[in-house]
From Swiss-Prot:
It holds the Pfam family Carb_kinase. (6S)-NADPHX 2 binds at G298, D412. Residues 56-60, 122-128 are annotated as: NADPHX 1. The lineage of its organism: Bacteria, Pseudomonadati, Campylobacterota, Epsilonproteobacteria, Campylobacterales. This is Bifunctional NAD(P)H-hydrate repair enzyme Nnr.
Amino acid sequence: MLSVYEKGNALDKRVLEEWLLSEDILMENAAMALERAVLQNASLGAKVIILCGSGDNGGDGYTLARRLVGRFKTLVFEMKLAKSPMCQLQKERAKKVGVVIKAWEEKNEDLECDVLVDCVVGSAFKGGLEPFLDFESLSQKARFKIACDIPSGIDSKGRVDKRAFKADTTISMGAIKSCLLSDKAKDYIGELKVGHLGVFNQIYEIPTDTFLLEKSDLKLPLRDRKNAHKGDYGHAHVLLGKHSGAGLLSALSALSFGSGVVSIQALECEITSNNKPLELVFCENFPKKLSAFALGMGLENIPKDFKKWLELAPCVLDAGVFYHKEVLQALEKEVILTPHPKEFLSLLKSVGINISMLELLDNKLEIARDFSQKYPKVVLLLKGANTLIAHQGRVFINNLGSVALAKAGSGDVLAGLIVSLLSQNYTPLDAAINASLAHALAGLEFKNHYALTPLDLIEKIKRL
């Protein structure tokens, strides 16, 4: 997993003060990272347009232009007059080696290009973009688009101006910034990469409590013993609500992810031999012996024995439970909560936090972190375009999910994966992380995003 920071200022300061690297060296390395992205996506001689702002982000752009001129048809547009000392210096250096620099007002030529590089605002963006920064029309003329550090129009909280630069790849300088991982930013950053600034990243980084999950972090269930039986791999119990299909999907998902036994219990529906999958065990009552249980999928009302069940085994709580105040009984237990934003708002209201959906979406990371600090036994998995998993103030971000998962039943499959890992003795945090990764990666395996069904998803999970 990768370390994530709200801002890179403290990291850069450490490089300058402790290791005596200069701003010049940092900027040269930033330009080298951008240069690699250009070389990977364009042939020599291709046309490259670089948009430069007034600060150090613009300085990165002028440095890039100096490195490209002679190999590419390089054109720089000065979107704002160079103001920072490094930006002014790099602009002069670029001019000395023959880089063509024009004011934006001089754009009287064909703006079509092979590569368009955004070095306008970066991390300095606040408020709204100036009217003349028409990235949308410019982007339509470029075959490939690169953003330096942060696409212009995304602020430090991940809020996005509707006219923001939409990149095919974003090179985050030094380390990944949390603003690049907001739900709203997901459509603007493209592929996310880190540009190293002259120091190995593990030396460059400082301690953080925010992390980006990677494919390599996934630890699938392991059956490495030959002398074993079903009891060695746990008993997961799934309680079915009024909409029984949701719980059945969870149960099938749990069975496909390694649980030795998966049982179901009908709370608000009827299950018969005709509509129960043969591989699931039917229980009329809550089992006396079990490893973990899942409740909430398709549920309308909280069962009267809910509090008693919480004492018997670790659990996953999903969907319908968050609309009932009885869920507060679970907040002092080791449980995994898996709400989507609307359900989380209902839960927050129950604990006395009244905010709007807009406030939640604009401050999702901070709110999830604060909630996990207030309820340290709980693991919160907050769904969204990027999933947040929060525990005791640490937040793990899964940005691997795709639009293929935007289907009814997808979340039920996820609940089943989590309860399966819980039943196999994963810690609640590890269960949430690994289930989330498996869920996302299985979604990426499906070719047509529009066609994925929950049962397809389970089949893909079996093949990870």
